[in-house]
């Protein structure tokens, strides 16, 4: 049918462009990028290549680190207020937020968490604390996705209740 009516076929995604996401989800970073290279990147992603001019600029790196840290503080405040969860803003934050599905690799990330847990138990401690955040949902009838969620919840309980490990991994 495409050969007959190519204009009737166009790709749709259930996502959002990274530029729109950046503009609304990380306003401080978006504002800084605009300060550095202007706002053309919002309509033409190739304009982001202009950022390469700043790759060795220590002042730019410092400002990016400041924005990142302020975002961590905002996440910390949100999690405390809305979920009662304490976040160490100096930890490495590893997030995976998407619908649970076998092909979306949440179980691979869970295996990584198990690996880190076993390393810590064996005495190999990370240089910085690691905070892992999973988010998502799964259809009630999708058994494997529900099993992945169950695995992650069990890992969370195991790690958070192990004082030897939870100093380094949450």
What are the roles of these predicted feature ranges?
Residues 1-170:
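Catalytic cores of carbohydrate-active enzymes across secretory and cytosolic contexts
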């Amino acid at each position: 049918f495409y050969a007959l009516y190519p204009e009737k076929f166009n790709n749709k995604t259930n996502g959002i462009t990274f530029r729109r996401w950046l503009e609304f989800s990380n306003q401080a970073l978006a504002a800084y990028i605009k300060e550095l290279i202007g706002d053309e990147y919002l309509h033409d992603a190739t304009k982001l290549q202009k950022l390469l001019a700043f790759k060795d600029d220590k002042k730019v790196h410092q400002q990016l680190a400041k924005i990142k840290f302020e975002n961590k503080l905002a996440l910390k405040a949100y999690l405390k207020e809305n979920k009662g969860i304490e976040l160490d803003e100096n930890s490495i934050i590893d997030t995976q937020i998407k619908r649970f599905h076998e092909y979306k690799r949440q179980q691979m990330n869970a295996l990584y968490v198990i690996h880190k847990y076993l390393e810590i138990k064996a005495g190999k401690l990370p240089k910085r604390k690691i905070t892992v955040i999973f988010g998502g949902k799964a259809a009630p009838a999708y058994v494997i996705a529900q099993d992945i969620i169950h695995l992650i919840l069990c890992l969370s309980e195991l790690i958070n209740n192990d004082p030897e490990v939870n100093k380094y991994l949450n």
